[in-house]
C-alpha cells in the first residue's frame, strides 16, 4: 500500500509542480534485480578473515569488517537513488562567465583538425566494444528478437565468435561439446547478437538519415512511430559506505545499441585522438595511476619557486544535476570538433570518397541530431517496470560518450566559476575526467582564506548550475603534495591510498558470486592498487592468493575487471596472473615520464583498418 501511495503521489505531484521526472507508463519486461550468492560471499569473507588475523591489528580488522559495509541491491535503495534526480527546474544564467566557460572548453578540447565519422561497417569490424554486456532494448526485451537468437551450436558453427574473448568464453562454458550446451539458446548479450544488432541498426540508421522518408516498409511499426528511440534499462552497481551512512550506488542506464553505435561512428576518431595524445586536452586519460600518472601529473602541475594554490572539487550527484540547456550548448560546440564534409575516416579498403555530396552531409547531420534526440528523450525503465522521462536534467551513464560528456560539462562549470572569480581559465591548468578534477590556479591563496575561497566556489556553483559541492571531500591546498585525484593522493609524484579502506573494498566484495578463482585475481588487482606502499597489505593479499593456489585453484581474469572496472577508456599495463606480483612489478611504471601501451593503442585505433593516425 505504501508503494501505491508513493507512486500515486509522485504522479499527481508532477501535474501540480512539474519536476524533472515524469511517469509515462509501464514496460512489459522490466530489468530484474541481480541476485547475490550469500554462501560464496561468506566463504570469501572467511578466507580474508583468516589472513587478516595473521597480519592486521584487532582494531583494523574491526574497522574493515564491522565499520564498513556494501550497500545492498534492493528495490527501495535503487528507487531512492533514481528519484534523487527528480529536481525542480533551474534556469542557467548564460551571462559572460558561462559564455567564457564554453569558449574555454572549446579551446581546451578542440582537436588539431575536425574529426571524421567512421562507417558503420568499420565500427562493426573494428571497434573494441565490451561484448559480454546486455544487448539492451529492443534486442534483450522484445519477443521477435529473442526468438531469433541462435543456439550455441549455430553460433560456433557460423564462426560468429571471432570478436569475443575466447578465454572468457571457454571459462564460462567449459563443456562446449556437450549436446545440451550446443542446443542451448545464447543469452541476449551484445556479443552473441552482434550480427542481428548491426543488421537492424544499419537499416534503422538508413531510415533516420533519410529524414524518415525512406521507411523500408517499417512505417507501421511502433519502432518507426517512436523514431527508433528505445527505453533504457536501469542497471546498478553498489559502493562501500560506513555502516551508519546511507546507501550509495552507481546506476548505469543501458542505452540502446543503435544509439551507442551511432555515437561510436561520430566520436571514435576524436576519442582515439585524445587517448593517443595524453595531455593534449584536459582529459586525464593517459594518467592512470599504475602507468605513472601521478608522476607525470606532478611534473605538469609543479610550480617550482613560484607558489600557487591547487583545487580539487567533489560534486554531489553530478550526473543528475546536469541541465539540458547547457548540455545542448556544449554538444553544439563539440560539433565543431567534427566534420561531415570529407566523408568517412579513410581506410585501406576505402581511402577516398569521390562521390561525397551535400546529401551525404545532410544524412549524417540527421543521424547526429537523432543522437541528441535520444539523449534528451529516451525514457528509463525502473526495476518495478515503471517508465520515466527526464524533462530538463540528467546525463545517462551508459552512453558511448558519457565520460566525455561529463568531462565537457565539468570543465565548463569549472571555467565559468574561475571566470566569475576573476581568473583566466586558460591560464590555469584544469584536468578533468568525468566529475573528477584537479586545478592549478594562477595565484597563491593564503591558508587563512581557503575556507572563504571554498565558500565562494560553493555559492557560484549553486548560482550558475544548481550544483552541489561536497565540501567534506573538496580541498584547497598550497602544495601539490597531498592533492587527490582519481582516488590517489600525490606524494612527490608517487601515488598513495588508504590501505584500510582498500582492504574493506576487497572484504565487502562487489562480486555477486566470488569464487576462489575470482578472489585470487582480485588479490592481484588490489596488490597493484596498493602501489606496494604497505607491506602488511601485500602480506594479506599474497596469503589469500597462496591459500587458494595451494588448494589447486587458478585466478580468473574477471576478478581484475571487478577491481578496476572494464571501461574501454581505461589504459592498464599487463598484469600476469600466474604468480603474485613482486614490489618491483607493481611499481614498474610508477616513474614513467611517457607511458605508451602499443597494444592498447592498436585496439583503440587499429592501423590495420585506418590509413592515418587519429586527428591526421
Swiss-Prot record:
Its EC number is 2.7.7.48. It holds the Pfam family RdRP_1. The keyword Nucleotidyltransferase applies. InterPro entries: DNA/RNA_pol_sf, RNA-dir_pol_C. It is an enzyme of class 2 (transferase). It catalyses: RNA(n) + a ribonucleoside 5'-triphosphate = RNA(n+1) + diphosphate. One of its GO terms (molecular function) is nucleotide binding. It comes from the Viruses. GO terms for biological process: DNA-templated transcription. Keywords: Nucleotide-binding, Nucleotidyltransferase, RNA-directed RNA polymerase, Transferase, Viral RNA replication. RNA-dependent RNA polymerase which replicates the viral genome. This is RNA-directed RNA polymerase.
Amino acid at each position: 500500500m505504501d508503494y501505491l501511495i508513493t507512486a500515486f503521489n509522485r504522479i499527481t505531484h508532477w501535474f501540480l509542480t512539474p519536476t524533472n521526472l515524469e511517469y509515462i507508463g509501464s514496460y512489459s519486461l522490466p530489468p530484474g534485480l541481480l541476485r547475490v550468492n550469500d554462501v560464496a560471499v561468506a566463504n570469501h569473507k572467511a578466507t580474508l578473515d583468516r589472513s587478516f588475523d595473521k597480519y592486521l591489528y584487532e582494531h583494523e580488522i574491526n574497522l574493515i569488517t564491522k565499520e564498513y559495509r556494501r550497500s545492498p541491491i534492493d528495490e527501495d535503495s535503487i528507487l531512492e537513488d533514481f528519484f534523487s534526480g527528480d529536481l525542480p527546474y533551474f534556469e542557467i544564467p548564460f551571462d559572460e562567465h558561462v559564455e567564457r566557460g564554453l569558449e574555454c572548453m572549446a579551446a581546451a578540447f578542440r582537436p588539431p583538425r575536425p574529426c571524421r565519422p567512421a562507417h558503420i561497417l568499420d565500427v562493426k569490424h573494428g571497434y573494441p566494444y565490451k561484448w559480454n554486456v546486455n544487448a539492451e532494448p529492443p534486442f534483450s526485451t522484445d519477443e521477435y528478437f529473442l526468438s531469433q537468437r541462435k543456439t550455441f551450436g549455430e553460433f560456433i558453427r557460423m564462426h560468429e565468435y571471432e570478436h569475443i574473448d575466447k578465454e572468457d568464453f571457454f571459462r564460462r562454458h567449459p563443456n562446449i561439446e556437450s549436446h545440451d550446451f550446443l542446443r542451448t539458446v545464447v543469452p541476449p548479450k551484445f556479443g552473441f547478437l552482434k550480427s542481428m544488432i548491426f543488421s537492424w541498426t544499419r537499416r534503422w540508421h538508413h531510415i533516420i538519415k533519410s529524414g524518415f522518408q525512406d521507411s523500408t516498409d517499417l512505417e507501421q511499426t511502433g519502432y518507426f512511430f517512436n523514431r527508433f528511440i528505445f527505453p533504457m534499462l536501469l542497471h546498478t552497481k553498489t559502493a562501500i559506505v560506513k555502516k551508519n551512512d546511507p546507501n550509495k550506488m552507481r546506476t548505469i542506464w543501458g542505452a540502446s545499441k543503435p544509439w551507442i553505435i551511432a555515437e561510436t561512428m561520430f566520436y571514435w576518431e576524436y576519442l582515439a585522438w585524445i587517448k593517443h595524445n595524453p595531455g593534449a586536452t584536459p582529459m586525464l586519460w593517459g594518467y592512470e595511476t599504475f602507468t605513472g600518472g601521478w608522476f607525470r601529473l606532478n611534473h605538469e602541475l609543479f610550480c617550482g619557486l613560484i607558489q600557487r594554490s591547487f583545487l580539487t572539487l567533489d560534486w554531489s550527484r553530478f550526473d543528475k544535476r546536469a541541465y539540458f540547456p547547457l548540455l545542448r550548448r556544449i554538444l553544439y560546440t563539440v560539433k565543431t570538433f567534427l566534420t561531415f564534409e570529407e566523408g568517412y575516416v579513410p581506410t585501406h579498403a576505402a581511402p577516398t570518397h569521390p562521390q561525397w555530396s551535400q546529401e551525404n552531409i545532410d544524412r549524417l547531420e540527421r543521424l547526429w541530431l537523432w543522437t541528441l534526440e535520444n539523449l534528451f528523450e529516451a525514457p528509463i525503465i525502473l526495476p518495478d517496470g515503471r517508465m520515466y522521462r527526464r524533462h530538463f536534467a540528467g546525463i545517462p551513464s551508459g552512453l558511448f560518450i558519457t565520460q566525455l560528456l561529463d568531462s565537457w560539462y565539468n570543465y565548463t562549470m569549472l571555467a565559468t566559476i574561475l571566470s566569475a572569480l576573476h581568473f583566466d581559465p586558460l591560464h590555469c591548468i584544469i584536468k578533468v575526467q568525468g566529475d573528477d578534477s584537479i586545478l592549478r590556479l594562477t595565484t597563491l591563496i593564503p591558508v587563512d582564506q581557503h575556507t572563504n575561497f571554498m565558500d565562494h566556489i560553493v555559492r557560484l556553483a549553486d548560482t550558475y548550475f544548481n550544483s552541489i559541492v561536497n565540501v567534506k571531500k573538496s580541498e584547497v591546498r598550497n602544495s601539490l603534495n597531498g592533492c587527490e585525484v582519481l582516488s590517489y593522493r600525490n606524494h612527490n609524484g608517487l601515488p598513495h591510498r588508504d590501505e584500510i579502506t582498500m582492504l574493506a573494498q576487497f572484504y565487502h566484495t562487489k562480486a555477486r558470486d566470488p569464487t576462489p578463482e575470482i578472489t585470487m585475481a582480485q588479490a592481484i588487482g588490489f596488490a597493484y592498487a596498493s602501489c606496494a606502499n604497505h607491506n602488511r597489505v601485500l602480506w594479506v593479499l599474497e596469503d589469500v592468493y597462496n591459500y587458494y593456489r595451494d588448494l589447486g585453484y587458478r585466478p580468473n581474469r574477471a576478478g581484475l575487471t571487478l577491481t578496476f572496472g572494464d571501461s574501454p577508456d581505461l589504459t592498464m599495463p599487463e598484469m600476469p596472473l600466474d604468480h603474485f606480483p613482486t614490489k618491483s612489478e607493481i611499481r614498474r611504471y610508477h616513474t614513467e615520464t611517457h607511458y605508451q601501451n602499443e597494444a592498447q593503442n592498436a585496439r583503440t585505433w587499429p592501423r590495420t583498418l585506418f590509413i592515418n593516425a587519429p586527428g591526421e
